[in-house]
Structure formats: structure tokens, C-alpha cells
Amino acid sequence: DSLKILDRTVKFAKELQELTGGKVPVVGSFSIVHSDRERFFEDHSALLKKYLQHGVEITPQWLPPIAWYFGGSIGLNVMNQYKDVEYLRRHELGVCMDICHLILGRNYYNFSAGDIIDNLKNQIKHIHIADAAGIDGEGLAIGDGDPENIALIEQILHYDCLKVIEVWQGHLDNGAGFKKALVKLAEIYESQ
């Protein structure tokens, strides 16, 4: 059951926080809205606030319209559209902004990714950085995606929050993909 998994995760995060004295980010995601969107955000807001009262913040992740899992893909219909911004702001939910997911959503739904970043700037708590192309090409090396993505990546580099490089298979070959991403991100940052 999902709530039992969430309870165990929060308990573990709390133990890590007590051990380290620092906050432990817990990033989660949702898949499909089975009821109406307002009810979805009300229910999830209440759930996340309950865990926050126990000292652990769970931050929902911005999702792609088509998510790839080992073995296939699934269409997602929440936390990936411009209309979700209003709900996130109204319910004061923090967000893990996954840049490659945002790019895929921009390409699928035809919205301005920069506008979403601007509208959620006070709620972005955590950022995942990777490039993307088309509607389902996620986790690409920085610079290997759609050319207009570099401006979006530049925009988020100055946000004061935890950032994680999330290039697909970046850990292989002694972290070659992560190293390449760090070098490219440093070039982008220094060129501003």
C-alpha cells in the first residue's frame, strides 16, 4: 500500500535528519488523477501537510506527460500542465522542478516553460537538471536536447535551492555523464 511505503520513507528521512542535523529532501511523484483535479490537490495537500507536521517535507516532482519506466511508458495527467500552477500556488505546495520533464511538457502541451518557472519561483524547493528533446526524450546530456533549452537551464542555475544532475546513466564509466554535465553547467553559469 502506498501510504505504508510513504510512512516508512518519512520515518527513515526523520531518522537521517536526527543523525545528520540537516534536512533530508524527500521528492515524490504522482501518476494519474482519477477524480477531479481540485479534489486531487486538496487530498494531496492535506497528506503532505500531515507529514510536514512530523518534520519531514515531501516535495512533489514536476512530471513529464509521458513517463518511461523499465518495460514501457505511461501517460501522466497531473503535475505537468500549465493549469497545475494555479493549484500548486493555491495549496502552497513546494515543488521539485524537474527541468527535462518541464521541457517535455512544454513540447507536448505547448506552454512557456519560463513562465511556469517564474510563476512557481517561490515554491521551487529542489531542482533536477537534465536536457530533453521532443515529447519523450528525457535525461539527455546538457546541450544534447532542443536548442532553446539552454536558456531555461540558465534561468534556473541561480535559484537558491538544492540541485541534482539527472542525466540518464550518468553514473556509468566512473560518472562520465555527470562530469560532462558539470562541465557544461559551469560553462553556462560562467557565460552569464
Regions found by a protein language model. Name each.
Residues 3, 7-22, 46-47, 90-192:
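Histidine-acidic metal/acid-base catalytic patches
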Residues 1-94, 104:
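Active-site acidic/histidine proton-transfer and metal-coordination neighborhood
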